[in-house]
């Protein structure tokens, strides 16, 4: 179980902003054990963890996740892509960067 309150604190956002980042309706946050919410938060954690391994810094990874547009994906951020269900594509992009591709 991932606590939306604790996770939003780590991300530096209000709990309601977590709804937007996860791509779930804000009312879903009233049921923090919601399968969909938990799945989305797990996807976010996977992507942020992979980015942290690449950068060596969790804060840089969180900043990248929320703010840096990815040219290969129409200049959308990792957060936007994950919210829209494309976590696997972002993870593949990070793997490409690890293998020497340029972002």
Model-flagged regions — what are they?
Residues 1-103:
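Non-transmembrane "mature" sequence context
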């Amino acid at each position: 179980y991932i606590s939306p309150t604790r996770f939003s604190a780590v991300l530096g956002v209000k709990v309601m902003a977590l709804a937007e980042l996860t791509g779930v309706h804000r009312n879903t946050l009233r049921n923090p054990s919601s399968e969909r919410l938990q799945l989305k938060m797990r996807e976010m954690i996977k992507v942020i963890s992979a980015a942290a391994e690449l950068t060596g810094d969790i804060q840089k990874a969180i900043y990248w996740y929320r703010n840096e547009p990815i040219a290969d994906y129409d200049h959308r951020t990792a957060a936007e892509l994950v919210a829209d269900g494309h976590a696997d594509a972002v993870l593949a992009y990070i793997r490409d960067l690890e293998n020497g591709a340029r972002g």
